[in-house]
Structures are given as structure tokens and as C-alpha cells.
């Protein structure tokens, strides 16, 4: 049985699709088996692009911007964790920054996870090539099982 589950979240409704599956899976085991769920938020350090006329230049986030983003991600994870704790689940939260797939794999190692449960946006064809797939990268690089959950049809990101 899985005792430490990592659930990466991106703040979207599609990204939350794995939560209900994990809640159902874990609720059948608690309290017989102690299961710890870690909700992970990854801040990708994408640059802003400033456009002036026909010229553009990449601009890094300021420390204040990163601090604000980190706080918003932490608030979201804590709010999500609180709603799950009402079901008697043990929930932790964690925020990192960097390449999303790399950070997910690193966090799984750090917490000694038995399972990574994540949602897939269901992109295919040219959209997958253009946008890449964090889920694919995690699935093919992980040393532990990865549960991929596709969001229900019609789920809209907010």
C-alpha cells in the first residue's frame, strides 16, 4: 500500500482532478494504514517579456514578485489541504521553484514518496509538441509508480 503520496498541483481545476481519486483511494485505508499526502506547488521561473515598439527583452521576476507568487501558491495549497483534512487525511504542503518535472521528481525523492498522483491535461498531437507534457516527463523519468488522472470531460481551468 502507498504510505506517502505526492500530488503536484498547478492551481487549475484540471490539475485538481487527481485529488478526488486520491481521496477515494486513501479513505479506504485510513485509519488502518497511515497515509501522508504531500501537495506540491512548483513555481516555474519563466521570464516576463517586455515589448517596446518592435523590440522585446526578457526580464526576470523581482524578489518581491517571487515572494508574492510563493505566498499565493502556499495559500492555495493550504486551503486545499484544509478541505482534505476534514476527511481525516494527513496532508502536508510544499512549494519549490524550477523546472516543473524536475522539481516533482526531486520532491518525490525528498519525501520518499511511494506514488506520484497527478492530473493530465490530455493534450495530444501538435499541442503536446508545442507545450510539452510535464506528466509525460515525470512518467518516463520516475523510479516510483505514477498515477495519471485525466480530468472529467468539460472541466474548465479557471
Regions found by a protein language model. Give the residues of each.
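A structural micro-motif
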Residues: 35, 89-91, 144
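Gly/Ser-rich helix-loop-strand patches that form or flank binding pockets
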Residues: 3-4, 9, 13, 106-158
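Small/aliphatic-rich secondary-structure junction motif
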Residues: 1-59, 154
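General small-molecule cofactor/ligand-binding pocket signal
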Residues: 38-40, 92-96, 147
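A short acidic, glycine-rich active-site loop
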Residues: 59-75
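Structural beta-alpha unit
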Residues: 24, 28, 79-116, 153-158
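Hydrophobic alpha-helical membrane-association signature
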Residues: 18-21, 73-76, 100
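Redox- and metal-dependent alpha/beta enzyme cores, enriched for Fe-S-associated oxidoreductases
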Residues: 31, 42-45, 68-73, 82
Amino acid at each position: 500500500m502507498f504510505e506517502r503520496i505526492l500530488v503536484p498541483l498547478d492551481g487549475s481545476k484540471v490539475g485538481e482532478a487527481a485529488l478526488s481519486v486520491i481521496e477515494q483511494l486513501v479513505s479506504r485505508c485510513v485509519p488502518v494504514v497511515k497515509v501522508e499526502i504531500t501537495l506540491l506547488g512548483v513555481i516555474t521561473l519563466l521570464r516576463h517579456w517586455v515589448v517596446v515598439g518592435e523590440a522585446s527583452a526578457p526580464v526576470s521576476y523581482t524578489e518581491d514578485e517571487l515572494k508574492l507568487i510563493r505566498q499565493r501558491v502556499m495559500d492555495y495549497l493550504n486551503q486545499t489541504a484544509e478541505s482534505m483534512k476534514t476527511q481525516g487525511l494527513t496532508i502536508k504542503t510544499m512549494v519549490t521553484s524550477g523546472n516543473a518535472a524536475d522539481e516533482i521528481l526531486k520532491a518525490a525523492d525528498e519525501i520518499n514518496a511511494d506514488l506520484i498522483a497527478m492530473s493530465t491535461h490530455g493534450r495530444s498531437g501538435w499541442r503536446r509538441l508545442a507545450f510539452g507534457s510535464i506528466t509525460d516527463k515525470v512518467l518516463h523519468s520516475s523510479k516510483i509508480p505514477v498515477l495519471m488522472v485525466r480530468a472529467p470531460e468539460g472541466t474548465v481551468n479557471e
